């Protein structure tokens, strides 16, 4: 009898320690699928709600694989007007590639989607900000990774509530640095040629 009580207690304790084991993990389960359900708080929660309301469905947030910015949310004064803007990386059931939503606050302080743009692949490899143009605006530099292993780079400019892709091309490595001494940052793209040589492009 004592042994039976002990086994029952041990089983209950084990179940208490493993609350996530009520369903089996399958190979096709994505981490992002598991992170979709929780409702976020603060600005992130407000951005998530604003995006879902605009889409009419629940967006799946996309996390960059590497780099300094590892969140699907980016809060920054992108257009240089002194007010904070936001960019959100996501996909939906209807989109095969990653999309980016750009949001601003309205007069009441609520986040509103201004525009969305479709990215170049289904995975975000890295994200960073760069000041590649004159003025106070900053550009969003996004590296994408396609399923077949190809890498693509896009640079987005967001001004006056509109987003434009000012660069979209394949790459192997890139660097953002003011190497010309002009005050703004420069974009250097590196790729390997068919003959094994290295091609370097400087975009200023």
Which sequence ranges carry the predicted segments?
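N-terminal export leaders
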Residues: 3-7
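Beta-propeller-forming repeat regions
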Residues: 21-204
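Hydrophobic helical h-region of N-terminal Sec-dependent signal peptides
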Residues: 11-15
């Amino acid at each position: 009898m004592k042994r039976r009580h002990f086994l029952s207690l041990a089983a209950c304790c084990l179940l208490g320690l493993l609350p996530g084991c009520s369903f089996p993990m399958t190979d096709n389960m994505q981490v992002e699928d598991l992170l979709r359900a929780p409702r976020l708080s603060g600005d992130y929660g407000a951005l998530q709600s604003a995006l879902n309301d605009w889409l009419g469905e629940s967006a799946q947030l996309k996390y960059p694989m590497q780099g300094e910015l590892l969140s699907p949310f980016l809060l920054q004064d992108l257009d240089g007007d002194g007010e904070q803007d936001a960019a959100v990386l996501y996909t939906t059931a209807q989109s095969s590639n990653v999309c980016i939503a750009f949001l601003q606050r309205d007069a009441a302080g609520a986040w509103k989607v201004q525009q969305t743009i479709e990215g170049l692949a289904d995975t975000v490899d890295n994200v960073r900000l760069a000041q590649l143009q004159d003025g106070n605006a900053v550009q969003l530099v996004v590296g994408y990774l396609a399923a077949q292993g190809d890498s693509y780079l896009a640079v987005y400019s967001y001004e006056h509530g509109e987003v434009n892709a000012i660069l979209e091309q394949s790459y192997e490595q890139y660097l953002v640095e003011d190497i010309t001494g002009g005050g703004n940052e420069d974009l250097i793209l590196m790729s390997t040629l068919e003959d094994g040589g290295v091609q370097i492009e400087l975009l200023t």
